[in-house]
Amino acid sequence: MTNIIELPEVLANQIAAGEVVERPASVVKELVENAIDAKSSQITVEIEESGLKMIQVTDNGEGMSHEDLPLSLRRHATSKIKSQSDLFRIRTLGFRGEALPSVASISKITIKTATKEVTHGSLLIATGGEIETLEAISTPTGTKIKVENLFYNTPARLKYMKSLQAELAHIVDVVNRLSLAHPEVAFTLISDGRQLTQTSGTGDLRQAIAGIYGLNTTKKMLVISNADLDFEVSGYVSLPELTRANRNYMTILVNGRYIKNFLLNRAILDGYGSKLMVGRFPIVVIDIQIDPYLADVNVHPTKQEVRISKERELMALISTAISESLKEQDLIPDALENLAKSSTRHFSKPEQTQLPLQSRGLYYDPQKNDFFVKESAVSEKIPETDFYSGAVDNSVKVEKAELLPHSEEVIGPSSVKHASRPQNTFTETDHPNLDLKNRQKLSQMLNRLENEEQSVFPELDYFGQMHGTYLFAQGKDGLFIIDQHAAQERVKYEYYRDKIGDVDSSLQQLLVPYLFEFSGSDFINLQEKMALLNEVGIFLEVYGHNTFILREHPIWMKEEEIASGVYEMCDMLLLTNEVSIKTYRAELAIMMSCKRSIKANHSLDDYSARNLLLQLAQCQNPYNCPHGRPVLINFSKADMEKMFRRIQENHTSLRELGKY
């Protein structure tokens, strides 16, 4: 008697379903991909209870014949490949013949389909993979597949499902990715009778992006294009000022298939170079057309991982396309704008005769307790803004009512502000150790700063500066060299930390409400977690498609911080599933101190330099900037004498002393 048996087909399909069907979103993905392969131009996805109760996908594609319909539930039965050679030149999204049998084995499935060649269609009903009904019916050309009671016979899988809102967010994300991959198809997603996504299907990728991420986001995206003999790269990338807290907004498409690829993600970030802040990621939609022989999609059950030949060449192509596109934009603010913390750009060129003969310098204002640039040639006043240079511009209004097609309440065009995402204020080269996305590392930094003890600072006598970066001072312990940027970062950090430490739970009504726009999946996740935002005084109301409105703000948040602050709190919530005023304010103090500190290569006059050292001496910890870098180093008199060999020690080299 043999111990090895061939598994029944239904059981084999259920085992395969464990790899192919992880959650309701997996079913939506497989059914929609089949509809795309059937050359559909319109696809409608309807779901109930986040797909656990019902998923229905309707398309106007080629349909199936009466003879092919029962074969579609047979494992490894497919119309997309017929020979081994076809496996290496796949242009369809599906090809294994596993998805539909796997879905049918763990649900009740109803299929209505018809082709153009016949006068009638077909109906198939199956439960648990067993066909119960197969008959001729009257139905339009195309296919309608309804999946009900998903996982009814695999209760263990149901146990690992997340909340309905979380599962719905996964479905929205799948439909959004497929919409971006195929802008020529009109997609509609309806959940419990409510329309969540709709694209026009015009073939214009920019319109598809606008339908998913919103018109305001699309306006801040640049077109990219590059090609060589093997690859053709095109798509859209966001300006460096428009970023998100994770990589979820980076979409890479290969021959119309959404894939995940770490190296290509790295190439995208390399294309931005130092223009992105550490821990921030751009919004990217990149379409790569490639010879199927150079891409192996048969390496993962969900086909989201693809092996690509000549991957290094493709990485270089992507990086070059992005960097060249960004070069054409005016991304670098002038020094005066940066130091004055202005959010308004002035592009008028002064005449050469108006330029001063002396070099630009930094000066200290004791009344304002801050540094400023004295520039006689500049006559126009630049308004001061806070922390984020990307804070909301009061001149930005909602100009067209059609931007809010589903508003429950009509608000005049000039009575709301569109909140802007915060711009990057410093780059990886400023602080390579600061990663706001690494919550564990950030938490360690905040704990270290919180537990700092009062330090005693030596009395210093300033006497000079080098390269507009380092200050020289002497004390009784010898020579001190101070990093002026790190020094003022420490001063500013402790100032902002103390200033914004108190939190008031009161709310203040906004004269002009703010609108906050999110992607479909983030919008759904935030609705589920809104109670956590309410606990810290942020009350967002649903206002139209993927949009919230804020009518009042907590007192602890300044009005000029509202746009950037609310987005930061929402990003924190989406990233960590928690939101903390303490963490937000600590991060804010760190980043404000960096933003508002003097940079390298700026000369200080003697008064400003001496005043900076006096402020530094009053700090709780004057020896390190908030990121942990040293503020100053010391050479004692003995060190100096050893370096100049005024002191010789027997049998001890200068290198062993570590001082030369």
Curated annotation (Swiss-Prot):
Q: Which UniProt keywords apply?
A: DNA damage, DNA repair
- GO terms (BP aspect): mismatch repair
Show the GO cellular component annotation of the record: mismatch repair complex
Q: Does the keyword Transport apply?
A: no
Q: Name the source's superkingdom.
A: Bacteria
**Residue stretches in coiled coil:** none
In alphabetical order, the GO MF annotations are: ATP binding; ATP hydrolysis activity; ATP-dependent DNA damage sensor activity; mismatched DNA binding
Instruction: Cite the Gene3D superfamilies for this sequence.
Output: 3.30.230.10, Histidine kinase-like ATPase, C-terminal domain (3.30.565.10), MutL, C-terminal domain, dimerisation subdomain (3.30.1540.20), MutL, C-terminal domain, regulatory subdomain (3.30.1370.100)
- Tell me yes or no: is DNA damage among this UniProt entry's keywords: yes
Q: What does this protein do?
A: This protein is involved in the repair of mismatches in DNA. It is required for dam-dependent methyl-directed DNA mismatch repair. May act as a 'molecular matchmaker', a protein that promotes the formation of a stable complex between two or more DNA-binding proteins in an ATP-dependent manner without itself being part of a final effector complex.
Family named by the database record: Belongs to the DNA mismatch repair MutL/HexB family.
PANTHER family to which the protein is assigned, alphabetical: DNA MISMATCH REPAIR PROTEIN MLH, PMS, MUTL, DNA MISMATCH REPAIR PROTEIN MLH1
Q: Could you identify this protein by its name? A: DNA mismatch repair protein MutL
